[in-house]
Amino acid sequence: MAMILVADDSETILLLMRTRLEMAGHTVETAADGQEVLDHVADGVVPDMLLLDAMMPRKSGIDALRELRNAGWEVPVLIVSAHQNPGDADAPTDLEIDGYITKPIDFDRLLETVAELTA
């Protein structure tokens, strides 16, 4: 199974995502914002996939993804957002984004998408 780095500023959502992903057999690292994502990567965490909240304090998931893509990272990415329709702020066209999940999270759909992207 995959090692997934999950970032969200809601502790509840992080706990739910960690629990559901681990129940599906994945290893999960969590971050409270985009800066923590970058810190994990700098500390040697090498995820098979990123699951990033679009909007977080300090550094958004989009900003963290932009930095990782500019550094050559090619891992699959799912963006999570409270917005029902992805706009440029949530899913900018200049970044390679593999999927978009809306809140409230449909965990069955999330797990299906993760399985497809990490197969």
Locations of the language-model features?
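Charged docking surfaces used in two-component/phosphorelay signaling
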Residues: L15-M23
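C-terminal output helix
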Residues: I105-V114
